[in-house]
Amino acid sequence: MTLILGIDPGSRITGFGVVRDGGRGCEYIASGCIRTGSGSLPERLQAVYRGVTEIIRSHGPVTMGIEQVFMARNADSALKLGQARGAAIVAAAEAGLEIAEYTATQVKQAIVGSGGADKRQVQMMVMHLLRLVQKPQIDASDALAIALCHAHHRQSLIPHGLDGARRRGGRLRL
């Protein structure tokens, strides 16, 4: 059984989700949001780093899936998102976690079956797959979807010795 951390990065709200992959489906462990407040960007990035570090310490995942940066309409927003991703990746790398990155389309395809699914469709499918009674917050739901996507990809890659994945900078590119 493998504990998987999913991260939906953001400079103001970073969603997280932890699931246990037992090979025949995943079990919900925890989810929530790291809210960084209205401080300066360095303070918010530090809050993301510390929050992810605490989640790793509390739950002990061995691997992490994180969403890749998408092309935002605003270049400044994309840069801040990339910096928040970096803070989360450094926290995971320091803890020795295996890190894999997924596009939003890959996550939606793995969870809903359509790369064009909206956030509510993803949220409802996450609830169904993890047998949740209450709706998780949207950012937490996205993070749980990333964790589930990572579990799915790990299952499909393990029998092949991760031959289908490329390592770049210590991270798996799928």
Swiss-Prot record:
Q: Which CDD domains match?
A: RuvC (cd16962)
**Which InterPro entries does the UniProt record give?**
RNaseH-like_sf, RNaseH_sf, X-over_junc_endoDNase_Mg_BS, X-over_junc_endoDNase_RuvC
Q: What is this protein called?
A: Crossover junction endodeoxyribonuclease RuvC
Gene Ontology CC: cytoplasm; Holliday junction resolvase complex
In which organism is this protein found?
Azotobacter vinelandii (strain DJ / ATCC BAA-1303)
Q: How is the cofactor bound?
A: Binds 2 Mg(2+) ion per subunit.
Residues bound to Mg(2+) 1 are D8, D139
Gene name for this UniProt entry: ruvC
Keyword check for Cell cycle: no
Q: Which UniProt keywords apply?
A: Cytoplasm, DNA damage, DNA recombination, DNA repair, DNA-binding, Endonuclease, Hydrolase, Magnesium, Metal-binding, Nuclease
Protein family according to the UniProt entry = Belongs to the RuvC family.
